């Protein structure tokens, strides 16, 4: 039976320092994170609490084996790490600043705390730039590619029932992950694979960089289905599906639908809802061909021999989801009203993309960006894929408000600025993130380290105290609010 889809987003941001003698992204990222954490701590709005790496197990593979020649992901304990009072993690991952949102209980809340991450990065830029010379400036982009064949990720995480066979997840999640780019692709000028100069614009920023159908790695030989088995919860009950095949969306609607539709598909898989064979015969080439085809008419062959388009696949999945929702408890993915809204938006965007894609420009990033770029190219007589269009592509994702083209694209907003501002420092109330963020703010001097599934306190006794948080839906305000509010210190 499907379980509650607690979820979250990890975003690695692009970074560079304007007018720097040489680019050092690790140093720039460290400056960014440290500047934010120091400024927040000085303002009394948050502590300087480090990350507890004790439970990090990136080499654990859901298939139970580590294939020969596979390089397991590194745990970079030496780089800057901080836990924020909103329950998030803000740190340096390889050569990028990364914001990992707190666990949330709905796709809409996923949007709120993802947007809060954008504001954290904006505040961090301001803080970092105060330390630089007048001619230098840290600039951050919410995108997935530097245009020079280097990609950085936007990863999603979904709690799933451990009892579900992993091969069922692979078989039934792959079609959605390969084809959902038609409505949640962020758009990209050009192609970063050798010899594909004919691709001047495509749906997805990440499609060029995937090489495997299933695998453990996240930076090399990237797989459509990642097998990292690191649940950050009770490993006997839960698995965390780590989805690395997704774009960094500027559209709130696209972020919401990316999370909501995927959560529904995963709930269907947990319930073993009958699904036709939609898996591509060749998943990686299919992923790329779909991204490169702006007509959305590209077909692929399923494992059972059918020929189908990405839009048709999404229509089938949407119809299956509607049938599933009619017979199952939808509270695991937000409830009847939320699911009804998602299904309606799902059908509508597929209709718009098929019949008049311009109608989707207020929701779908690749359409919105393509319209901006197309208008600019026409006005200035630019060839497709020109350097100026590549620069505008980057500017779409620029977090500086006075430069960000996405803010001028007429994208639909789903959440209020007040919600986002609150979420910068406050955690969601209905997951364990509430306890993490609240005790960090309330008992700052007694928290030693924290991670997703535990917090270590120094209560003044002879040994440190570790409080496990192995249940993602516990540690909420409803369960612990009165106790925390009535406690004078962590020992109580």
Name each model feature, range by range:
Residues 1-136, 140-141, 171-186, 190, ...:
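Terminal catalytic/cofactor-binding subdomain
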Residues 126-129, 136-212:
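Internal, well-ordered domain-core segments that constitute the primary functional module
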